Amino acid sequence: MGTIYGANASLVSKDNTYGIALYQSYRNRNPYDADGDGFSELGKLNMNTFGLRTYYRPTQFSRISLEYHTTNEFRRGGNKFDLEPFETDITEQTKHVINSGGLSYDIFWKEYKHKLSFYSSVQHTDRNSYYGAQQNPDAYGKTKDLTWVVGGMYVGNFEKVLFSPATFTAGMEYQNNSLHDIMLGYHRDMKQDVRIAGGFVQNEWKMNRFILLAGFRVDSHNLIDNPIFSPRVNLLYKPTDKFQARLTWSTGFRAPQAYDEDLHVTAVGGEGVLIKLADGLKPEHSNSFSGSVDWTANIGHWQTNLLLEAFYTGLDDVFVLEKIGQDEQGNTVKERRNGNGARVYGVNLDGKLAHGRDVALQVGFTVQRSRYTKYENWSEDENVKPTKFMPRTPDYYGYFTLTSAPFKNFDMSVSGVYTGRMHVPHLAPDFSVIPENYEYSYIRKDELVHTPDFFDLNLKLNYTFVLNDHIKLQLNGGVQNLFNAFQKDLDKGGFRDSGYFYGPTQPRTYFIGVKITN
């Protein structure tokens, strides 16, 4: 059971000199226990958000923009929700207070052919957490995270650069992140300061049938010895308005730093599972290629579009997680280390078919392979085989959306998401700490489970009442996950692997709503 409330408003002056938009939302969700064991599969959630965006034009050729967003979020999963976390068998609880804002100044000249932008943003996150099991009184934690960014960018449109008209873009950016995460019960007091100075240049040439974009970015990261050079090239061929083909090459990297998922502590067998970074962890580099053809046609009163895309990404020094043992407190430790490499490649097909507002259908399907180049260990158990499969990456996935407005004031939509089979790690508990009557409730050793596939179908109906010329009242209702496609082999009880969860995150859910617009 849950509720969602939301409101937004906007105001723009008649001469477009200034404007402001505000939004606010509230969401509440009760915990959901799918298998009746007293432990939630879907946690309790309370969230408030508020934000605003505003702009002011001092002159015809300048613009100042300001935005502010705040989120207050409480999440809790586990059991015995009426008790304090340290009185339960398992609790994963976080409370986030996030405040962020941004300020930018844009100036144009020569009939908007040139633009100079300066921008800055800041985000502060204050998080209080509890990740513990078996009435652990010391599993509380606190995290403070501050990120700020400043930068500038120039965009210029020129009649000719070398051989054709072009749009030139260049900019510089500095980013600073300070993170302090304390969990004394797990003997973790981590401080991380990340400083990144970057610059980028690109040029887009526009010819009769071709558009060529070439550029690069250089980043200096304080946790990486040498600057990272990341080039990219994009070539678009468009002989007609109804057909185009594109080739793209790009590069990127992930720095050897702690990310948000590294601060999360799951529970297996009543003990915590921590993630640590390996000594000498190197950055992960990516090299991506893609090609696509896009065809549009009108067949009678029908509009059609077909997109076929092939993609390939090579990852070097790919980040992998391996279970390496236990710390002095008996908590399982996973280490983020560099693997040999990985390859992600496949084909994607998207199609659209529409007949005005009467009916529109969009369908997409992807065939993908995500494999390590060599077998990688993921468990400390020597009897568990290493794998080439990248975890939690299906080989097949797709979606469809069908919308229709068969008569005035009524419209409907049917949508679905297909998720193919994937390999998901399932960790066994330490049986030396489990009571004898629980021993046969859990797997005996770590397993890489080949999951079933899922089809998540959703239905929504809308009817709009026109109250007067300016106010409309919409009533809507429907069902999400109509077939209740949900994981069947959930771990049960207080010694379960709380990270063993896959597939749709929401069970069959009925909803009704009211929307008023002016």
Residue ranges and their predicted role:
Residues 316, 418-436, 463-518:
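C-terminal beta-signal and adjacent terminal beta-strands/loops
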Residues 15-34, 117-130, 167-175, 190-232, ...:
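Surface-exposed extracellular loop regions of Gram-negative outer-membrane beta-barrel proteins
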Residues 206, 305-306, 310-314, 335-429, ...:
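Gram-negative outer-membrane beta-barrel transporters
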Residues 29-49, 57-114, 122-145:
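Flexible loop and strand-edge segments within Gram-negative outer membrane beta-barrel domains
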Residues 1-36, 43-50, 470:
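Outer-membrane beta-barrel translocator/receptor signature
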Residues 94-98, 122, 126-130, 135-212, ...:
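Outer-membrane beta-barrel transmembrane domain signature of Gram-negative proteins
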Residues 7-9, 16, 22, 117-131, ...:
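Membrane-embedded beta-barrel scaffold of Gram-negative outer-membrane proteins
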